Design a protein with these regions (language model features):
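Extracytoplasmic/periplasmic substrate-recognition and gating elements
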Residues: 68, 140, 262-264, 303-369, ...
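Hinge/lid segment of periplasmic solute-binding proteins
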Residues: 75, 99-153, 181, 200-207, ...
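Conserved N-terminal structural module of periplasmic/extracytoplasmic solute-binding proteins
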Residues: 2-3, 7-11, 15, 20-108, ...
Length: 458
C-alpha cells in the first residue's frame, strides 16, 4: 500500500512538472534579437528627442517579434569616451544613429561597409539626392544610407537691407553677379558706425561699429577653402603632405582677415564676446545683415524672427567661380564589433523608410535626403516661417561639398582639426595680423601630425 501511494505521489509530481514546463515561455534560440542603437554622435540626446525616439522604439517593438530595439543615449561631450568604453568592454552597440561625417571619421576603422547589403537586397537608392549618396562613399567602403542633410545658405535681415535701400541677394543659383566680392560690397553698405556712416563712406569710423553687414561663416575653417578652389582637407590625396599655407587655405584665411580688419564688415571674436553675449549666432541680434550657416541653425529661427524679418539666399561664388554650400549630414553606421550586423541593417532600413525618415528629420532638424520628401519639408517650414524661401535650402543640396566633405577623415583627425581651428582663432581674435605666418605655423604643425601618423601606420 505504501509503495502504491508513493508511486501515485511521484506520478502526480511528474505530471505537474510537465505541465509547468509546457506553460513556461521558451528562451534561447527563439528569443528576439535586441539591437542597441547608440545616440550621441549628433542630435537626439535632448529630453524631447529622447522621448520621441523611445516612442519609436515602442512602436517598432510592438510590431516586430524577432527583433527588438533599444536606444542608448550619450551627451555630445561624452560620446567619444562612452563609445570607446563600450568597444573596449566588448559591449559594442549595433548601430550608431544618427551620426555625421565627423563621427564617422572619429572611429572610421570601426564601421562596416554596407554596400554588400545594398547589393544583396537590390536596395533602391534612386530617391536619394546624388550628392547625399556620394557623401557616404569613401575610398574603401560605403558607410550608411542618407538620412538627412544640413546644407548652408545665406541668411539675411530684410529690415536692414530695406533701411539701407540695398537690393536683396539672389535666391536662385546661377546668378554670376553674386560673388564673395559682391557680398563684401553689399555688406559695406550695411556696416554702420555710431554716426550712421557706412563702411563705404570716407567718414566711417571702424573703431565705433554698431552694425555689421556680414557675420561670417558659422562652420569650422574647413568649410572655407573650397570656396577658394582648395581642398577642404588641406593635404595631398594620399594624406601624407600638408598643403595649408598656400592656395585655398591661404586665400580663405586672408579673406577672413580682410573682412574684419580691412573692409570692417565682420565682427572679430572680441566683438562677438562683448556685443553678442548669450547668443549662438550674431544674426540673432538684429545688428548683422547677413551670414552663412547650415540648416541645423533652425533651432535659432525663433530668435532670428524676434530680431527682424529674415530670409535666405544662395551662397555666393568664390573668386575662382566655385559655388560651395558646406554641408553636414546624418546617417547610420554599423560597428564591426556588433554581434548582430544583419539585424542592425534590417533595423536601419526600417528607419530609412520615407515616412520614418520624415519623422526622424523632424526630431533631429535635418532636411530629408529623399527627393520625394522635399515638397513636404518646404511646406512644413514655410507654414512655420512664412517669410522664408525654403526652396533655397533644397537647391543648395546640389552645391554641397560632398567629396571630400569638410568633416572627412584625415590622419590624426582630432589633432589636425583642433590645430586648424586654433589658426582661425588667431585671426578672428586679432592675435596675429600676419596671415602667411599663421598658415606657415599651421602647415608645420599639421605636417608633424601627418608624419607621426604614418610612422605609426606604415
Amino acid at each position: 500500500m505504501l509503495r502504491k501511494r508513493l508511486y501515485l505521489v511521484f506520478a502526480l509530481f511528474m505530471a505537474g512538472l510537465m505541465l509547468f514546463t509546457a506553460c513556461t515561455p521558451k528562451t534561447g534560440g527563439n528569443a528576439p534579437v535586441k539591437i542597441t542603437i547608440f545616440v550621441g554622435f549628433g542630435a537626439g540626446s535632448d529630453p524631447d528627442s529622447m522621448a520621441a525616439l523611445n516612442t519609436i522604439a515602442e512602436e517598432y517593438n510592438a510590431s516586430h517579434k524577432d527583433i527588438q530595439i533599444e536606444f542608448m543615449f550619450s551627451t555630445w561631450e561624452e560620446h567619444t569616451s562612452k563609445f570607446s568604453t563600450l568597444l573596449a568592454g566588448d559591449l559594442a552597440p549595433d548601430l550608431a544613429f544618427p551620426i555625421g561625417i565627423q563621427g564617422i571619421a572619429e572611429f572610421y576603422d570601426e564601421w562596416i561597409d554596407v554596400s554588400p547589403y545594398v547589393k544583396r537586397d537590390t536596395y533602391d537608392t534612386s530617391d536619394f539626392y546624388g550628392p547625399s549618396l556620394q557623401l557616404l562613399n569613401f575610398n574603401d567602403k560605403t558607410i550608411g544610407l542618407p538620412l538627412g542633410v544640413y546644407p548652408s545658405v545665406t541668411f539675411f535681415n530684410e529690415d536692414l537691407f530695406d533701411a539701407a535701400n540695398v537690393p536683396y541677394p539672389p535666391k536662385q543659383y546661377g546668378d554670376t553677379t553674386w560673388t564673395l566680392e559682391k557680398m563684401i560690397e553689399t555688406a559695406k553698405l550695411m556696416t554702420l558706425d555710431g554716426n550712421g556712416n557706412n563702411a563705404a563712406s570716407p567718414n566711417f569710423d571702424p573703431t565705433k561699429i554698431t552694425q555689421w553687414g556680414w557675420g561670417g561663416w558659422c562652420g569650422p575653417f574647413r568649410t572655407v577653402p573650397g570656396k577658394f578652389g582648395g581642398n577642404p582637407l588641406g593635404m595631398s590625396d594620399d594624406f601624407k603632405t600638408a598643403n595649408m599655407n598656400t592656395d585655398g587655405y591661404l586665400e580663405g584665411m586672408q579673406f577672413l582677415y580682410d573682412s574684419i580688419y580691412t573692409s570692417h564688415v565682420r565682427p572679430s571674436s572680441v566683438d562677438e564676446g562683448s556685443t553678442f553675449t548669450g547668443m549662438d549666432f550674431t544674426f540673432e541680434s538684429g545688428k548683422v545683415a547677413m551670414f552663412e550657416c547650415f540648416s541645423w541653425s533652425s533651432y535659432a529661427f525663433p530668435n532670428f524672427t524676434t530680431a527682424g524679418n529674415w530670409n535666405v539666399a544662395a551662397v555666393p561664388a568664390g573668386p575662382h567661380g566655385d559655388v560651395v554650400s558646406p554641408v553636414n549630414a546624418d546617417t547610420f553606421a554599423i560597428p564591426s564589433h556588433s554581434k548582430h550586423p544583419d539585424q542592425a541593417w534590417e533595423v536601419a532600413t526600417w528607419l530609412m523608410q520615407p515616412e520614418m525618415q520624415s519623422r526622424l528629420c523632424g526630431i533631429f532638424g535635418c532636411i530629408p535626403s529623399r527627393k520625394s520628401l522635399a515638397s513636404g519639408w518646404v511646406d512644413s517650414m514655410s507654414a512655420e516661417y512664412p517669410n522664408g524661401d525654403f526652396q533655397v535650402f533644397i537647391d543648395s543640396i546640389n552645391y554641397m561639398d560632398a567629396s571630400p566633405n569638410n568633416e572627412s577623415w584625415v590622419p590624426n583627425y582630432s589633432k589636425v582639426w583642433d590645430t586648424t581651428e586654433n589658426a582661425m582663432s588667431r585671426i578672428l581674435s586679432g592675435e596675429s595680423s600676419d596671415v602667411q605666418q599663421v598658415m606657415n605655423d599651421l602647415q608645420t604643425e599639421v605636417q608633424g601630425y601627418l608624419d607621426e601618423y604614418w610612422a605609426a601606420n606604415p
